[in-house]
A protein has these predicted regions:
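Positively charged n-region of N-terminal signal peptides that target proteins for export
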Residues: 8-14
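Sec-dependent N-terminal signal peptides of Gram-positive bacterial secreted proteins and lipoproteins
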Residues: 14-30
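Intrinsically disordered, low-complexity N-terminal segments that are enriched in acidic
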Residues: 29-143
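Alpha-helical and coiled-coil interaction segments, frequently adjacent to or embedded
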Residues: 82, 274-304
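Secondary-structure boundary elements
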Residues: 149-215
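Hydrophobic (often cysteine-bearing) scaffold residues that line and stabilize catalytic clefts
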Residues: 156, 177, 222, 226, ...
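Hydrophobic/aromatic-rich core segments of domains that either
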Residues: 224-288
């Protein structure tokens, strides 16, 4: 016991200090873990938005740059934030108190309807056709499979720049610019009935009619192709817009003169004639036909 007699008081103080430190850690472990994940880890990984990031904020999806989720709403908002920034791979953590995190991730991945709504609120170039999740303890890593390749984006940007330079001038009002783009799509795009029938009957079809590539390159498209094409051109002109979708259809919602108005180019395309029935109309008007119903929860700020 020589060492104890020699170091007596110092050793006792050391043991007490170690005991206090361990007690403090286990008592406040959750807060400490979250602190280091949120501050230390976040300081070393920054996700910058790409050229197609949209600086918007909505009722259903809100930007959340945190790397820690505490509930399912946090997960959806983090997903929206990093998909909107164009990220193809990103990770975040479940908070130490979030016991249902793995269950909620599995639930979202098994029924992707909530996640797919994100596509309506981001630039079409940042939209995706599939998403995967890898769970490693409390770390969640997502991989995004985008709708548009880099070569498609370059080709579309070249075409869109040409369309706008040849058809839009600075003297036009916002409504006039939208009308020009609306009419351009009608005159230069044909609805692809063959593709629509194949999809309806679960027949594989590798054409691009569901994308802007179909509308602007191949001049054959279904509703999602018309809608993406108009959305991309509106974003090029810095005109705020999103998409609205239900199980059977998708169309554009455009912010004009401080009001959100609907435009459905697909149903305005009657072949050789231009129809304006669904051009910049309010919600009551577009819902009257019974074909344009949508989730009032997801699109809550656009009901009137």
């Amino acid at each position: 016991m020589f060492w104890y007699n020699y170091y007596g008081d110092d050793m006792r103080r050391y043991i007490i200090l170690v005991f206090i430190c361990f007690s403090f850690y286990f008592c406040f472990k959750v807060k400490i873990d979250d602190f280091f994940q949120k501050n230390f880890f976040y300081n070393y990984i920054k996700y910058e938005g790409n050229d197609y990031y949209l600086d918007n904020d909505f009722n259903y999806f809100k930007e959340n740059n945190s790397l820690i989720a505490y509930n399912k709403e946090d997960i959806l908002n983090i997903l929206y934030t990093f998909i909107n920034k164009g990220c193809e791979n990103f990770s975040f953590y479940c908070g130490s108190n979030y016991k249902d995190c793995r269950h909620d991730i599995d639930e979202l991945m098994n029924d992707k309807s909530s996640i797919l709504y994100i596509n309506d609120f981001v630039h079409p170039y940042n939209s995706f056709h599939n998403i995967s999740a890898k769970i490693d303890k409390n770390k969640i890593t997502f991989k995004i499979f985008k709708n548009y390749s880099y070569s498609e984006i370059n080709e579309l940007n070249y075409i869109i720049k040409k369309i706008i330079n040849e058809n839009i001038n600075v003297s036009m009002s916002v409504r006039e610019k939208i009308k020009v783009l609306h009419n351009y799509l009608i005159f230069n795009t044909e609805y692809d009935n063959d593709y629509a029938n194949d999809i309806k009957n679960s027949i594989p079809n590798d054409k691009n009619s569901y994308k802007a590539t179909g509308a602007l390159v191949n001049h054959l498209a279904v509703c999602s192709g018309y809608t993406d094409a108009l959305s991309i051109m509106l974003n090029y002109l810095k005109i705020k817009n999103i998409k609205i979708s239900n199980d059977n259809h998708v169309w554009n919602l455009i912010y004009v003169d401080n009001v959100w108005l609907h435009t459905d180019v697909t149903n305005d395309d009657l072949g050789s004639d231009v129809n304006n029935r669904y051009f910049l109309v309010n919600t009551d008007t577009i819902k009257f036909d019974g074909k344009h119903n949508f989730s009032e929860n997801v699109y809550s700020e656009f009901q009137r």
